[in-house]
Amino acid sequence: MAFKIKTFLSIKSHKIFYTDFYFFLKKKLIILIKNIFPEYFNFNNKYKNWNLICLPDFLYFKVNNTHFLDNVQYINSLIKIFLPLKFQNLKTNQIFFKNLLIFELPKYNSHNYCYLNGLKKIFISKYFTSNGIFFHKYLKRKYDIYYAKILLTNSNFFNIVLDLKLKQIYLSIKNLKFNFILFLYYLGINNKDILKYSRYKKSKILKLLIFTALQTNLINNKKFILKNLNYLKSIFKVTNLNKNYKHFIINKNKLNYNYGNFNKNNFLTIDFIFILDLLLDLQSKKLCFKNIDHLDNKHINTIGNYFQHNFKFYLKKFISIIPNLIKLKKFSLLKVYNFKELLILNPLIQYLEQINSFSELTHKYKLNNYNSSLKGILNLREICLNQIGKLCLIDTTEGINCGLIVNFAKHIRIYKKGIIQIYVSPVFKNKTKEFINFKTSLDQELYLIQFNNINLRKNKLFNENIKVVYNKNNFRIKFISNKKSFLLKFADLFSFTENLIPFIKYNDPARCLMGAKMQSQSVPLLNKKKSFVVTGYEKEIITKSDITIKALQEGIVLNASSLKIHIKDLFNREIVYYLSKYKKSNQNTLIHQKPLVWNGERVFTNQLLTQHQDIIDSEFAIGNNLLIYYGNFCGYDFEDAVIGSKRVLYQQLFSSLHMDIYEFNFGYNNENDIEFSTLEIPKQSYYIKKSLDSLGIVKEGEKILTGNILLTKIKVTKPNYTYKSIFKLIYSIFGKTIRNIKDNSLYIQTGKNGRVSKIELFLINTNSHYKTYNNSYLKCRIFICKQRFLTVGDKLCGRYGNKGILSYIAENADLPFLQNSFYPDIIVGALGIPSRMNLGQLFEALVGKIGFSYNIRILPSFTSSSNAYFNYLKILIYNFLMFNNLKKGFNWLYNFNLPGKFLIRDGRTGIKLKSSVLCGVSRYSKLIHMIKDKLHFRTTGPYTEILQQPLKGKKNLGGQRFGEMEIWALEAFGASYNLKEILNYKSDDCFARNNLKDYLLFRNSELQNSTITESFRVILKEFNGLILNLELFLITDDLEENYLNLTINY
């Protein structure tokens, strides 16, 4: 199948997983119930005799109506599965039908997520080893042992082991081990059949194996087989093999390519003999091994397969307890299995990352690359050559799951049975065709796969015909003048995350991985700009993302507002698209959509109708272009610390919006005991109630501070008097009945300041089946939008893994400046570039400076570098700088001695500095790890018993924890007392603590200096355990007999 490149926008489509889920419900679930459920259930008791018949062919589903479902409340609709049952009374011959509710599952929508507990959750795909034959080799007693592992569909497997030292071949199933030749006799295969169908009928090795089976092990193995005959029949009986044999030797075309001819019409006779021949081929080194982790031997598990696997367990459990669940008089179900709990506990079903539209896209295309058994997990972490074009070579998770959780490549297609296909362009006579072809791993190894931009020599004629190609799972250098080959582009080796890095070739791959992760962790900004240096894939990301609204049909826009868009399509149908306004993501960032079309505009299929908060002109833009100096300033740029200017703060270049939601209910016990909201609350002044409306709810658009009231809630109850005479006396004095008033108003906590953006009120239907709160009649939800400015302690990052903590915000007048009076936006230390091999950020700074000077955007093209070879980028940058110098008329813009560097002056004195610095324009963004979320305080709290350190985390009332980059920022700022407390006294000094307590309480001892902390004492014990001794000696002056001062900080 061929497609034009212009119209091809294929990736792991959501429709595959969406249709697979519903195909399981419509087809596979019926087959599963038929296989597991017995056809008849007989219930006999003293009074009635009943016969129960299951009717899985009439299985039907029911989804919640929109009357009960409110999309605003993020309540996911449930799919109810009903099993029709037929009841028959054997005495009276009475027959009636009953629909039995057996399961409830959350609805899985076409965007590859479902709602659980009000939050979006996504299913991560998983690789599973396909059923079939796998060959292995291991060393035992200095001899090679060859064996074939055969995996069946029911997860059973057995091994056929060839041991030439013992001169035998045997079959092993779990703990059973017996001769393979005798096993063939058991299947009805005699010596004549073995010699007839085997290719080694004249070989001495095969005759030796038959002879040893007959002479040495005949009696013992025959008794052993007869003893375990029932177990063998349960595995190899014909009824089981008829079901399993379709996948027993899976995909015989694959095995024909790898190992030879498998007869498709035969059952087991020739196939087992052929496996014997393959083991002998491997022993004689006529064939090479195929790794079990090869992508040919794996398939992708979808959510339909996940439910199918778990339904087997629940259906079997359901059968065992179905007599107790059904009451014969009422015929009602007492217990329903809800799969919501199963989806919450599964580690592959995770909360969707919604920091920005890019993070949501990358999270959906993750892949679990290992099975439940973690054997050989070190080999799985490595990059296999067969993953080229299918899995990203760089993108993976960090930590213990490194190499196990990977991402799909940019352009792939999921084919039948979960097989990955890549697209390649055919090349003939060094000309790339317009059409593309899809190739699997098998097809990929049959043809020659070229990679562009790989030049072996400087001679052009040599590079035209001799190329580096990928063939038969290896890289080769071949002459391909007239041979048919295919081209795999450089961008198709990576996922979307890496393709957003412009100069990825000039960076360390580990830093590229870090830069890709940080782009998905960047916060959408209020004042964002498109970068001067682009890669060309910014618009393609938006077409793949589901966070924007795309047109389903071609039509004319009737009405476009901030709430909804009306479109009339070609069939005169009216389609309404509702926009998300001021919604909260899973990471508390703001989701806000704006319309891109106007009234009367003609829209086409898959055209963008809205834009997100991180989209500008249908292009992903999440940062700002900043003028950067690579140098130092008063030591504030220590290690990776960043110095910012006040201009960045005043112009709000890194200001972001975040959302908090407060949700509460109004309940009741009876008519006289009810909660309500009112403006007349006791013991509160007018100043506190000025932001409330007449109902006692905060007004929309109000600015709220710490201690303000969001909503008033009062509960009035009648007092209980034991004596009615006292109640009458109080009524006669005051003239009113006395009531107990309890104030349950909601106040703003510290650090939660913001502005009320939206208020939602919901009436709770007390008669509804989907009632979520007991004794509640009203639910109120208040959205508070917070604007966070750039502060000291926030983390800034670029696109190349370069990140740092903002350590100081300086005045513009104090910063060094260029000869045209340009002040830098941020100053970054230059020592981190060569040590981390981050040359890409230097190229981006220089090319961005050119784009800033000419007011243009630059797309670096690496495909045209074949003419200039390795000097292409250097020539490009030098020419741009020189032309910029000639156009502006300033000689200082291009220094012939130091190209790309500029002389600067000190902003405080105006004196020209001795050294020159590299100055450029690069894109920076703000990460979600902000200082307001990190800082928390405590006066007292729990400590660990051994190290005497504060516990970790806010949940445990732990102490403040500082990371490596936070320490660098403190060192740059010169916070010596904080550093001493963090580094030296992070663990308490028990002796000094007790001395301080005695001094403050009893005054019976003098206050002494601090000694060694408890954690340092633990380190000393660890050294002693390693037979190392650490001692401290004082140096003395022998002439004056005085101790010399020795200051040591532990």
UniProtKB/Swiss-Prot annotation:
Catalytic activity: RNA(n) + a ribonucleoside 5'-triphosphate = RNA(n+1) + diphosphate
InterPro entries in UniProt: DNA-dir_RNA_pol_bsu_ext_1_sf, DNA-dir_RNA_pol_su2, DNA-dir_RNAP_su2_dom, DNA-dir_RNAP_su2_hyb_sf, RNA_pol_Rpb2_2_sf, RNA_pol_Rpb2_3, RNA_pol_Rpb2_7, RNA_pol_RPB2_OB-fold
Compartment annotation: Plastid, Apicoplast
Superkingdom as given in the UniProt entry: Eukaryota
Keyword S-adenosyl-L-methionine: no
Record GO terms (molecular function): DNA binding; DNA-directed RNA polymerase activity; ribonucleoside binding
The EC number(s) this enzyme carries: 2.7.7.6
Keyword Oxidoreductase in annotation: no
A cellular component term, taken from the record's GO annotations: apicoplast
Main location: plastid
Keywords associated with the record: Apicoplast, DNA-directed RNA polymerase, Nucleotidyltransferase, Plastid, Transcription, Transferase
Its biological purpose: DNA-dependent RNA polymerase catalyzes the transcription of DNA into RNA using the four ribonucleoside triphosphates as substrates.
Protein name (database record): DNA-directed RNA polymerase subunit beta
Source organism (scientific name): Neospora caninum
Lineage summary: Eukaryota, Sar, Alveolata, Apicomplexa, Conoidasida
